[in-house]
Every structure is written in C-alpha cells, then in structure tokens.
C-alpha cells in the first residue's frame, strides 16, 4: 500500500526502484540527482523518507555527496546528512531571485570538480524548482547551447511525460540565465518606472463584465494595489498607474477578477519578470534580430518587437497567454482567447541613467492600502503546461558526468 501511495504522489516523475530502494529520485547525470523532499514522520510515508535517503546516499556515495535544499517553506535535521546541506531557498511555484542562480552554479561547480562527488538537489516535489536550478547549471557548464534544449533534456530524464519545468515564469528565468551566459553579461538590477499595463482581448470572467484588479510585488513585498478600474476599448483594456511605480530587479504582477465588493477575488494569472531584460528603443538594434534575441533563438516571453508610434518612448514587454502562469493552462480558451496578450510599459529612471550600481536590495515601501490577505505564496498544485517538444532519446544513452 505504501508503494502505491508513493507512486501516486510522485505522479509522472521517474523513481529509483533498484537495490531495495523505492525513492522519488532520478539521476539527471551520474553526478547530479533530482529528488523529492526528504521527509520525516507521517509525510515520510508518502514522500521520500529521510532515513531511506540517508541510507541510499551512504550506500552509493558515502562521504562524497552534498544536499541542495531549494525549499523556502521547510527544513529538516541536517545532522542526518552530516550537515552536508546547502540552502538556496525560493518559494514553491515561483522562480528564484535571479541573483541566487549564479552562486548556486558556482557552489555546484566547486563540489563536482572532485571526480567522485555527487549533488542531490531537491525542492518539495523535486521537479519545478529543482529543474530550474539544474537546467541553469547545465547551461553554466556549457552542456547545452540553448535554454530550450536544457529544459527538454531535464523533462525527458526526470519525468515520463516530458513535463519537467512547466511554469512559464520558472522557464523564463532559465532563459534569462542562458542569455547572460551567451552574451557574457554581468547581471545588475536595473531600476525602471512602471507606467501601465495593457490587455489585448478581454478575459471572459463573468462573461463580458470582467473586472480585473492587480498587485505588484518586489522583494516579496507588495508595493502596489490597483484601486481604479481599467479603461476599456474594443478588445482592449488599459491599466494606468496613478503615478509611475519605481521597480527594480525581480517583480511579480498578479491579476484577480472581483465582480463586486461582496464576491471574493478570483485568481486570473500572474507572472515574474526581471527589469534587466526589458529593452528600450535604442536596444532593439543590438538585442533583437528578426524578432528574436541575437545569440538566443527561442526567448519567447522575454522580448517583443511589437511597437507602435505612440509607444516609442517606452521600454515595452509583451507576454502571450502561454507566458502567463495559470492562464497558460486554459487550453479550452474558456477564460482567455488564444490571442490574449499582456503588454507592460516602462521608462528608465534618472538613477538608471547615472548609477550602474543600483540594486534590487534598495528599500521598497510596502503597500498596505487594501488590508487583504497577501497572496504572495499562492500555490497551484494542479500545474500542467504545454508539453515540451520531443527530445532525442538517443542522447540519454550517451550521458557522462557533468
């Protein structure tokens, strides 16, 4: 019965079922393991039991392994693993802070520089967050030239249905890191002013009476809550900030539908972007070539070449339906048309023009105007994104250590 429960909980992830072990654990490479959370007590009945994980690692890689815990929401007794545990935490169903990725890759690189060492990387389910960081490392090591190839490879090896990293914002951050590597860029948080948001086509919440509201987060702090309703035009909605909102680094925008004051908010979608990757008019000639980034041919959801004469003064980013967390799962087009798009409009700040050392750690002012529960930790456990493109299975048999 326990084996059946474990199989059900791990869903389509590949399990390690050899030598008397039955663990939600996969060798992505001979020296890189992706696994589910090593749990204790009752949770250990249906997830990886921490004692079984210790026994496995001691029997296979004694004194040559290190655990990487990506969970922000939970911990365990690191003494079980002789304190060989590093923590690079970020929230479930969210991407990591961009500045977390490079130190993780450098840490992993140092560990694996010794031939016998093995890294065991986990989040809660050992799929999404784990996949983001493993894919970033594979790009860091030059194992794949493009983010899409690393994501496809991970999805094929870790799961039976090729759905590894499926959340759009998490995938976006793998592309971000790929772009930095490809162009030998040093990341720095870029301060911008956020002016407005535009919907192309109207979402179909409550029929034609959709009433979207939104919040903006930075550094896990809610910095803006919309109060005024959107402006409407044929097949368009506009959301203007009362005054330009200063943002820098990783930001999250979350949309809700609220029909009236009595009804509860209904989650529509959310997304994460980083201000470093939002281009201005003068940057298009360098960064965009035939609608794609120079040096990276598959960066959907990072740059858009759509620009009207009225928008020339703005730095513009367009996100399609498939680039939006939660909206991308509306396969039947019940709530969003297939052409639904969100456009974001920014300008550079005086600080950005004069100070290249700006940091996302700059203090932010919390917005407490709505007195409503903070939805930052929103979790949707029913995630299922579009399947990745087919992967060449011949590559699986040719894997060597990273």
UniProtKB/Swiss-Prot annotation:
Name under which the protein is recorded: Phosphatidylinositol 3,4,5-trisphosphate 3-phosphatase and dual-specificity protein phosphatase PTEN
GO cellular component: cell projection; cytoplasm; cytosol; dendritic spine; nucleus; plasma membrane; PML body; postsynaptic density
Keywords: Apoptosis, Cell projection, Cytoplasm, Hydrolase, Lipid metabolism, Lipid-binding, Neurogenesis, Nucleus, Protein phosphatase, Synapse, Tumor suppressor, Ubl conjugation
InterPro entries per record: Bifunc_PIno_P3_Pase/Pase_PTEN, C2_domain_sf, Dual-spec_lipid-protein_phosph, Prot-tyrosine_phosphatase-like, PTP_PTEN, Tensin_C2-dom, Tensin_phosphatase, Tyr_Pase_AS
Motif annotated as PDZ-binding, chain positions: 400-402
Function description: Dual-specificity protein phosphatase, dephosphorylating tyrosine-, serine- and threonine-phosphorylated proteins. Also functions as a lipid phosphatase, removing the phosphate in the D3 position of the inositol ring of PtdIns(3,4,5)P3/phosphatidylinositol 3,4,5-trisphosphate, PtdIns(3,4)P2/phosphatidylinositol 3,4-diphosphate and PtdIns3P/phosphatidylinositol 3-phosphate with a preference for PtdIns(3,4,5)P3.
Comp. bias intervals (Acidic residues): 382-395
Name of the encoding gene: pten
Region ranges (Disordered): 354-402
Family: Belongs to the PTEN phosphatase protein family.
Domain C2 tensin-type: 189-349
Domain Phosphatase tensin-type: 14-184
Catalytic residues of the enzyme: 123 (phosphocysteine intermediate)
CDD domains found in the cross-reference section: PTP_PTEN (cd14509)
Cofactor(s) needed for function: Mg(2+)
PTM comment text: Monoubiquitinated. Deubiquitinated.
Entry's Gene Ontology BP terms: apoptotic process; cell motility; negative regulation of cell migration; negative regulation of cell population proliferation; negative regulation of focal adhesion assembly; negative regulation of phosphatidylinositol 3-kinase/protein kinase B signal transduction; nervous system development; phosphatidylinositol 3-kinase/protein kinase B signal transduction
Organism listed in the record: Xenopus laevis
Biased composition (Low complexity): 354-368
Uppermost EC category: hydrolase
Subunit structure and binding partners: Monomer.
Cellular compartments annotated: Cytoplasm; Nucleus; Nucleus, PML body; Cell projection, Dendritic spine
Catalyzed chemical reaction(s): a 1,2-diacyl-sn-glycero-3-phospho-(1D-myo-inositol-3,4,5-trisphosphate) + H2O = a 1,2-diacyl-sn-glycero-3-phospho-(1D-myo-inositol-4,5-bisphosphate) + phosphate; O-phospho-L-seryl-[protein] + H2O = L-seryl-[protein] + phosphate; O-phospho-L-threonyl-[protein] + H2O = L-threonyl-[protein] + phosphate; O-phospho-L-tyrosyl-[protein] + H2O = L-tyrosyl-[protein] + phosphate
GO MF entries: inositol-1,3,4,5,6-pentakisphosphate 3-phosphatase activity; inositol-1,3,4,5-tetrakisphosphate 3-phosphatase activity; lipid binding; PDZ domain binding; phosphatidylinositol-3,4,5-trisphosphate 3-phosphatase activity; phosphatidylinositol-3,4-bisphosphate 3-phosphatase activity; phosphatidylinositol-3-phosphate phosphatase activity; protein serine/threonine phosphatase activity
């Amino acid at each position: 019965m326990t084996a059946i429960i474990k199989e059900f909980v791990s869903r389509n992830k590949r399990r390690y079922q050899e030598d008397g072990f039955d663990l939600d654990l996969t060798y992505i490479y001979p020296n890189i393991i992706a696994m589910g959370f090593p749990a204790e007590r009752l949770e250990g009945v249906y997830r990886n039991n921490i004692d079984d994980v210790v026994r496995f690692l001691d029997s296979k890689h004694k004194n040559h392994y290190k655990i990487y815990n990506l969970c922000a929401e939970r911990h365990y007794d690191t003494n079980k693993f002789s304190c060989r545990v590093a923590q690079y935490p970020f929230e479930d169903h969210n991407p990591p802070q961009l500045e977390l990725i490079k130190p993780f890759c450098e840490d992993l690189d140092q560990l694996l520089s010794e031939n016998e060492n093995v890294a065991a990387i986990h989040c809660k389910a050992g799929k999404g967050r784990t996949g983001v960081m493993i894919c970033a490392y594979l790009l860091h090591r030059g194992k794949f030239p493009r983010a899409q190839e690393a994501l496809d490879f991970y999805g094929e090896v870790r799961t039976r249905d090729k759905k590894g990293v499926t959340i759009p914002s998490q995938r976006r951050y793998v592309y971000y890191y790929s772009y930095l590597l490809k162009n030998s860029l040093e990341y720095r948080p870029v301060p911008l002013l956020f002016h407005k948001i535009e919907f192309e086509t109207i979402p179909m919440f409550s029929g034609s009476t959709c009433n979207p509201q939104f919040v903006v987060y930075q550094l896990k702090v809610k910095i803006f809550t919309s109060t005024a309703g959107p402006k409407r035009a044929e097949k368009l909605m506009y959301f203007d900030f009362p005054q330009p909102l200063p943002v820098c680094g990783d930001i999250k925008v979350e949309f809700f539908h609220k029909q009236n004051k009595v009804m509860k908010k209904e989650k529509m979608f959310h997304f994460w972007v980083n201000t470093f990757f939002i281009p201005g008019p003068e940057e298009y000639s360098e960064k965009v070539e035939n609608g794609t980034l120079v040096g990276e041919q598959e960066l959907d959801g990072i740059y858009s070449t759509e620009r009207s004469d009225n928008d020339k003064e703005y730095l513009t980013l367009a996100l399609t339906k498939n680039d939006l967390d939660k909206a991308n799962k509306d396969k039947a087009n019940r709530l969003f048309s297939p052409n639904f798009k969100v456009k974001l409009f920014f300008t550079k700040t005086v600080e950005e023009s004069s100070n290249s050392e700006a940091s996302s750690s700059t203090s932010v002012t919390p917005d407490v105007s709505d007195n409503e529960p903070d939805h930052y930790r929103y979790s949707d456990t029913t995630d299922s994104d579009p399947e990745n493109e087919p992967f060449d299975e011949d590559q699986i048999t040719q894997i060597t250590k990273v």
